[in-house]
Amino acid sequence: MVKRVHIFDWHKEHAKKVEEFAGWEMPIWYSSIKEEHLAVRNGVGIFDVSHMGEFIFRGKDALEFLQYVTTNDISKPPAISGTYTLVLNERGAVKDETLVFNMGNDTYMMVCDSDAFEKLDAWFNAIKRGIEKFGDIDLEIENKTYDMAMFSIQGPKARDLAKELFGIDINDLWWFQAKEVELDGIKMLLSRSGYTGENGFEVYFEDANPYHPDPSKRGEPEKALHVWKTILEAGEKYGIKPAGLGARDTLRLEAGYTLYGNETKEKQLLSTDIDEVTPLQANLDFAIFWDKEFIGKEALLKQKERGLPSKMVHFKMVDKGVPREGYKVYKDGELIGEVTSGTLSPLLGIGIGIAFVKPEYAVPGVEIEVEIRGKPKKAVTVAPPFYDPKKYGAFREE
């Protein structure tokens, strides 16, 4: 069954392209990817990302459980704030990249990828059942994916919009810090976060979903529709644009961010054609707290000892051409890797991408060739982001 977000009907009416993504029928663009992309880089855009997964972990053992099933140290951030962390399998491969918020009172909210929440649901509950065989565990795991609406407001003008709507300056929050706010009586969680490289915030709140898989929980999304329309109306003076998943992908790629399923992944059951990727290969070791035990740690330590089979690197095209997932990467005629993400940068007007290559080439400044339509095209490896961070991005010079 194709999944749909709360205000799918609004998107269906206003978006020029709607199609399935990770099992969800989602808006890809409303006007054009380029127009929406540049609106976020230069002004402000709003994304409906209610297809993202959410879990609530409650109980005295919630923290200990999360410390074991994720890689980072989530014990330090105070309520209410989040930690970027990873869920790994026993082989050290990335099951998903997640954000875990400490909500206080032994309660945590995890935000995960849209195509990972079902397998994570099964994974977490299987681990819990395994623990219960040896004793009691004070832990409740609740999957809130279909109940939670999530909107992402991104761009340099997002700060002005947050001040107007909620009376807060998001620059007073550290990255992933959150506050409980209200909009016209609708209570929600607001976090300084995003997936575009720009400054911005995201809001979470529960509402009825007319497409909920449980018929008893279906209803009209009055809150979600009101919040969406209110933000659009308030943002008109700032040139706000509704933005689809197409622009979200080009924005994250310009920022150099990984995408689950492309840069981070694990082998699926009975599959032999999907390479597994560990956080060491994907330059995500900043999200690993080594002074604790977690699933996959032993495998990562062994990989560190024997060396990496490949490593992630960013590159930009020198010759004309747009790199795409699966294209081969060469160095002096030798096959050294493969592209995992690529696009034509709407901001820079050149081809950019991410590839996994032999580790010795995964440094900036290496001249490589990308095979595009059967022909080698010159490219060079670079350090992310692709744009000038003094002119664009969350920490641009004002």
Curated annotation (Swiss-Prot):
EC number(s) from the headed UniProt entry: 2.1.2.10
Key words, A-Z: Aminotransferase, Transferase
Catalytic activity: N(6)-[(R)-S(8)-aminomethyldihydrolipoyl]-L-lysyl-[protein] + (6S)-5,6,7,8-tetrahydrofolate = N(6)-[(R)-dihydrolipoyl]-L-lysyl-[protein] + (6R)-5,10-methylene-5,6,7,8-tetrahydrofolate + NH4(+)
CC annotations in GO: glycine cleavage complex
One GO molecular-function entry: aminomethyltransferase activity
Pfam family, one: GCV_T
Ranges in coiled-coil conformation: none
Function: The glycine cleavage system catalyzes the degradation of glycine.
Subunit record text: The glycine cleavage system is composed of four proteins: P, T, L and H.
PANTHER family the record matches: AMINOMETHYLTRANSFERASE, AMINOMETHYLTRANSFERASE, MITOCHONDRIAL
Family: Belongs to the GcvT family.
Protein name in UniProt: Probable aminomethyltransferase
